[in-house]
């Protein structure tokens, strides 16, 4: 069969040219689309090149260009994130302590290429658990169990200092370190509760003693006042019998007021109200 005898199709060259343009255009759009990548807010990127490896440049937020097939961006979140760890260890006086720690951690932005080379993308899971557990064991072992309670702030500062130094060796920054929980064994907890009860009982006994002392002093002062009052009354009676008469009149007034306010009816002599007022001697003693 001879292909020279195949008739020419009208418009075939134009169709072929259009197909070529479409293919080239599609490849161009695909290449352009795969040549751009975005770095979101709070993130940074490093570039891996198949020929040269990791580049030293750190790419900030925004849209950036890369060579498809040859380059691949690795994007890191550089915002501080909380990391929680609980560890059980022994104190200086051999008490078991369960301590919880919360750290705010982030990668150092200018050290991302080195972080990727040595630790990869899951840097926090590879570094933080080990250095946190080791630091907690080392610091807690320096304190007695009671000191961990009374000197909690100092313990937290020491843990933060050591952790910050150790994390910086792996290009990781720690913005905050705080102790969240501190739990002791049953025996130590029972001893603490018993000590608190004893302290409360001691305070209560001290209060009772102080109150008894105050009552004693009040009784002495009251007795001294009554003795002085009796002495003054005796002197007044000795000097003037009218003092007794005055006291009788005051007593009669109180009796009359009480009877007047009472619901019961009482009949008394209007002359002396049963107090022999008419027989009173108002003349001063000579």
Curated annotation (Swiss-Prot):
GO terms for cellular component: extracellular region; mitochondrial inner membrane; mitochondrion; plant-type cell wall; plant-type vacuole. The keyword Coiled coil applies. Mostly expressed in proliferative tissues, including vasculature, shoot and root apical tissues. Its main location: mitochondrion. The chain crosses the membrane at residues 14-32. It is found in: Mitochondrion inner membrane. Residues 186-219 form a coiled coil. It is a single-pass type II membrane protein. Signal peptide: none annotated. Residues 1-13 are mitochondrial matrix. Residues 33-286 are mitochondrial intermembrane. Keywords: Coiled coil, Membrane, Mitochondrion, Mitochondrion inner membrane, Signal-anchor, Transmembrane, Transmembrane helix. InterPro entries: Band_7 (IPR001107), Band_7/SPFH_dom_sf (IPR036013), Prohibitin (IPR000163). Prohibitin probably acts as a holdase/unfoldase for the stabilization of newly synthesized mitochondrial proteins. Component of a prohibitin multimeric complex in mitochondrial membranes. Belongs to the prohibitin family. PANTHER family: PROHIBITIN, PROHIBITIN-2, MITOCHONDRIAL-RELATED. This is Prohibitin-2, mitochondrial. The gene is PHB2.
């Amino acid at each position: 069969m001879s292909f020279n005898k195949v008739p020419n199709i009208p418009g075939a060259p134009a169709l072929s040219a259009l197909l070529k343009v479409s293919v080239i255009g599609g490849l161009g759009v695909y290449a352009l689309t795969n040549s751009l990548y975005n770095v979101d807010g709070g993130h940074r990127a490093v570039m891996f090149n198949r020929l040269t490896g990791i580049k030293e440049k750190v790419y900030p937020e925004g849209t950036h260009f890369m060579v498809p097939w040859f380059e691949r961006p690795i994007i890191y979140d550089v915002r501080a994130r909380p990391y929680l760890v609980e560890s059980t260890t022994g104190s200086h006086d051999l008490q078991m302590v369960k301590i919880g720690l919360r750290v705010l951690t982030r990668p150092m932005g200018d050290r991302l290429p080195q972080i990727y080379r040595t630790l990869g993308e899951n840097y926090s899971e590879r570094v933080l658990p080990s250095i946190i557990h080791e630091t907690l064991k080392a610091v807690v072992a320096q304190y007695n169990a009671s000191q961990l309670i009374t000197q909690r702030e100092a313990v937290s500062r020491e843990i933060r200092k050591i952790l910050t130094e150790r994390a910086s060796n792996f290009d990781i920054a720690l913005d905050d370190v705080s102790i969240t929980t501190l739990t002791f064994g049953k025996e130590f907890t029972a001893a603490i509760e018993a000590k608190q009860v004893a302290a409360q009982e001691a305070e209560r006994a001290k209060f009772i003693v102080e109150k008894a002392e105050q009552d004693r002093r009040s009784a002495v002062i009251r007795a001294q006042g009554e003795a002085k009052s009796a002495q003054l009354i005796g002197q007044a009676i000795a000097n003037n019998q009218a003092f007794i008469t005055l006291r009788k009149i005051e007593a009669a007034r109180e009796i009359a007021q009480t009877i007047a306010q009472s619901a019961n009816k009482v009949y008394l002599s209007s002359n002396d109200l049963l107090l022999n007022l008419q027989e009173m001697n108002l003349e001063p003693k000579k």
